[in-house]
Amino acid sequence: MKISGGGRCNVTHACFDARELTRRYPRGERALIAPFKQFQAADTVAWFEQRGVKLKTEADGRMFPTTDSSQTIMDCLLNLANHAGVKLKTNCDVQSIVKAAGGGFELTLANGKQMPCDKLLLATGGCRTPALGQLAISLGHTLEAPVPSLFTFHVETPWLRELAGVSLEAVEASVPGAKLRERGALLLTHWGLSGPAILRLSAWGARELHDRNYQFALQINWLPDANPEKLAAAFQTCRRSQPAKFIVNTPLAKLPSRLWEQLVIASGIARETRWAALSGAGQHRLIQQLLRSEFPVTGKSLNKDEFVTCGGVRLNEINFKTMESKLCPGLFFAGEVLDIDGITGGFNFQAAWTTGWLAGRAMAES
């Protein structure tokens, strides 16, 4: 929480229709329909505001505390827990959990001490390694193998890396041969590609890209609102209106000048080529480069603001009205320990707030 959203804490997303909200989850969409009808993003906003924490909405729908500080959210939760008499035990690893003979559970801590409880909530976070899911497995649950989600792409193409820092508001990224296509902002980095379009693509393709060992072809459409006919007409206009100008010096459609220059050169058009001298073959190659640039992805890096995994406790083993285990009465689950993950933008926090609220209410009432 402290480092999420660049240290500002992306609490939730301004998507206040429960069914629409579920569509932001590559894993867990169907399971979250009923829970979001009980507690969704609007309820999260109201919950925090009733406790003195106001949220603001940014242009892309992400919601943050008005203080722009994760500490505000942390202080709110810690103060409420303290007021409720919650005891926080840190540096207190749980080594094992067993069902107690007389009901409830017996926890064995790393220091050898035993801790009994009547009901138990597992909210251990994403299972970044299989070991983190062992507590759930020991109580009879099945773990969908964890793999990374929300990661950036390594691309070795030299000219692309030279453009580190260049950003675009809207491109379309896709993986040929897969049903993976996302539109959004893109950031060129010294290791390859990042930004919302890439992060969302990585979330929807988490398992498929893992199975490809993160080595695949990526296509970028730099002008998703254009088509070959529109570009051909624009080039013809340039031939007539500025025939003596060098193509590399006259970016089209407000593309960043450095990017335009590299795309022209990558199309096999010499730097000294003027618009009047642009051949039909050169025009075709440039249109292809603008609409279907292809790059070999050679690996991934985790997004530094979010540590999200695809995978976790199998959803058909959970009662989503209460978040109680169907296999082990008295055991509850919440958050990313479940096989639920959302795209970037506050959706993973929202799933945690919702499942935590349902589990807490059910544990208190049962």
Task: Provide a role label for each language-model segment.
Residues 2-3, 12-18, 54, 142-147, ...:
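An anion/pyrophosphate-binding glycine-rich loop and adjacent beta-alpha core
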Residues 2-87:
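Conserved N-terminal/central alpha/beta ligand/cofactor-binding core
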Residues 63-71, 150-158, 300-317:
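Flavin (FAD/FMN) cofactor-binding core of flavoprotein oxidoreductases
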Residues 90, 262-341:
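A glycine-rich dinucleotide-binding beta-alpha-beta segment and adjacent secondary-structure elements
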Residues 90-104:
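A conserved short coil-to-beta-strand element within the FAD-binding core of flavoproteins
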Residues 94, 114-128, 135-137, 186-191, ...:
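Short hydrophobic core segments
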Residues 119-161:
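Glycine-rich loop(s) and the adjacent beta-strand/alpha-helix scaffold that form part
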Residues 123-139, 339-366:
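A conserved FAD-binding loop/helix module that cradles the flavin
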